[in-house]
Amino acid sequence: MALDRSIISKTTWYSVVLWMMVVLVRVHGAAARPNRKEWDSVIKLPTEPVDADSDEVGTRWAVLVAGSNGYGNYRHQADVCHAYQLLIKGGLKEENIVVFMYDDIATNELNPRHGVIINHPEGEDLYAGVPKDYTGDNVTTENLFAVILGDKSKLKGGSGKVINSKPEDRIFIYYSDHGGPGILGMPNMPYLYAMDFIDVLKKKHASGSYKEMVIYVEACESGSVFEGIMPKDLNIYVTTASNAQENSWGTYCPGMDPSPPPEYITCLGDLYSVAWMEDSEAHNLKRESVKQQYKSVKQRTSNFNNYAMGSHVMQYGDTNITAEKLYLYQGFDPATVNFPPQNGRLETKMEVVNQRDAELFLLWQMYQRSNHQSENKTDILKQIAETVKHRKHIDGSVELIGVLLYGPGKGSSVLQSVRAPGSSLVDDWTCLKSMVRVFETHCGTLTQYGMKHMRAFANICNSGVSEASMEEACLAACEGYNAGLFHPSNRGYSA
């Protein structure tokens, strides 16, 4: 039967022709590509819904946390700004994204592009438009917990924005900073302790105010925050940049491959963080599952099985969530609708810097680029010397405390012992905090470098040492030491 074009509008005629072309393409390709999911996206229009059986119900919420400050930690705020822009492109609303960042990077005098933050050597500005919900002194563990729980009464400062989620909503939490066994750093003391965080997640679950939650954590020893204590029945899935015993890594650093623009003297990103975000940007998140991203990020963060310059990405909690599509948490960018499954897969190793050394890395870059005779060069050298001195003091003090508590033959082995996989770091988290406070009172603040000794304090608790004995050992180990700016009276206690 012929179609009478005279009775059909031009727009309708074009629609009919387009429909016929689509049918022909489908018929022609059906035999060669019988799996619908393999070929449907090739002929879809950007405005066409991708999944007819979508499980999308409720609101997507997100909490993004950069847990550090200082230009040497540029990459953490860059990670968070990148995550924000990715979620906005995915359709999440600003009112449903809560951002924690100190906000001392974009306008820092060391930033060669004033007011701009990038997360990739060829990246665009990620800072513009990022909401300043909790900045400066308001980036605290207490505020973070209040935001997650939706408890405005516990907030101190900030925008007042919280996760006011409902039972059908999904939540995505992303954290980037330094860490140590059982802890995550924050720019204002105290640090975030693992059991406190787990307790908050349990409270959130008990409130019945979300359907499912996905958490990504970038930090050294980040697996220890969940290992042995993360329940599987909270409808929460977690991946971490590293296992319970290893470092995570900064990348896109000066003098390395890939390198940032030559005017930059600090690392732009972190290996795990850029791995998951660049993966999300390169894929149709209505097609890619949480599990697929986990596998991709795991491979890239290992630096393709080069664990001397990479780490083991771990997963905890409810792994049933891994079957779901990523868009349920990160949203969907229509521009990615036709991206093929293997789009953007990197197969090359990346040069990296140990997260704990990034601060010294910045100082060394500053020293190298200073004028040979400048007073500034001398000041930088003093900063390097002071930083190294305090690191040696922390390392030496912890080692000596082990000797005083257990004897010269056992001290080191007890403090460095690692529990069996799947075990929690410590039995008594209150004891852990107490031991840290005793140490910091007499020996100075741990700092982001000293976080690595948290396992030693955990083992002191696990072996039954009393607080009085710990006090005595710390007094003997650090007697006469002037912590100066590193004293907790200046920085606060990390516990």
UniProtKB/Swiss-Prot annotation:
GO biological process: one example: proteolysis involved in protein catabolic process
Xref: Gene3D superfamilies: 1.10.132.130, 3.40.50.1460
Record InterPro entries: AE (IPR043577), Legum_prodom (IPR048501), Legumain_prodom_sf (IPR046427), Peptidase_C13 (IPR001096)
A Pfam family: Legum_prodom
Glycosylation sites: 138, 320, 376
GO cellular component: vacuole
Signal peptide: 1-32
Catalytic residues (UniProt): 178, 220 (nucleophile)
Record-listed E.C. numbers: 3.4.22.-
Intrachain disulfide bonds: 253-267, 431-461, 443-478
Domain of life, per lineage: Eukaryota
Keywords: Disulfide bond, Glycoprotein, Hydrolase, Protease, Signal, Thiol protease
Site feature Required for post-translational maturation and enzyme activity, where: 267
Entry GO MF terms: cysteine-type endopeptidase activity
Physiological role: Asparagine-specific endopeptidase involved in the processing of vacuolar seed protein precursors into the mature forms.
Similarity field: Belongs to the peptidase C13 family.
Protein name as annotated: Vacuolar-processing enzyme
Organism: Glycine max (Soybean)
